[in-house]
Amino acid sequence: MRETPSPQTLRAFLNGHGIAVSPQQAEMLFEHVRLMLEWNLRSNLTRITEFDRILTAHLLDSLLPARWLPLTGKTLDVGTGAGFPGVPLKILHPETQMYLLESNRKKVSFLKVLLAGLSLPGIHVLHGRWEEPEGWFTEEDERFTAVIMRAVRVEPGHLTRLAPRVLRPGGVFASWAGSGTETALENRRTHAYPAPAETRSYELPGMSAPRRLYLWRMEG
């Protein structure tokens, strides 16, 4: 695909991969990409700067696993970076309450500018570290239906210590991963590193190995 970047080409690309996108949603997704590339000239938001590659490596990779996620409640996107997957998921699933957690101040500033321009209700930026929930989550806060991680490596403590503090009973902890992660999980699996309840695979165009989504469910 070597077409002029536009909301129309973005929409055609996603529609061609089975993701229904309205013209208004395509405009918002395109603005996300456009502003990210503009800010990337002075801030390190992404190493991927070609429009075609962004469509695959950021947008499509964010949206294809949506079919396996509970996106009707309150969702936390950990280490969201430039807003992937949280912002695209929120645009296509407006019913979810999306919270974007990011520790980098420049990326937090970018996200605030992006969300102000999109005027998208029900999406919030949290400045903090996943490992320090006391800085962004209190016992009075409503727990999350889903915690999602696309660019953060899952550690045992994420599942045994942190997830129970912020996930509601029956909630889902989801991690995006490349094909090599399955072996790593098998090698490190202990009682403190439980097996995923589900493993889902999907393919991205131009990539030889499948991507995977690992899902853990919080005990009720």
From Swiss-Prot:
One of its GO terms (cellular component) is cytosol. It holds the Pfam family GidB. Keywords: Cytoplasm, Methyltransferase, rRNA processing, S-adenosyl-L-methionine, Transferase. Its EC number is 2.1.1.170. S-adenosyl-L-methionine binds at residues 79, 84, 150. Belongs to the methyltransferase superfamily. RNA methyltransferase RsmG family. Specifically methylates the N7 position of guanine in position 527 of 16S rRNA. This is Ribosomal RNA small subunit methyltransferase G 1. The gene is rsmG1.
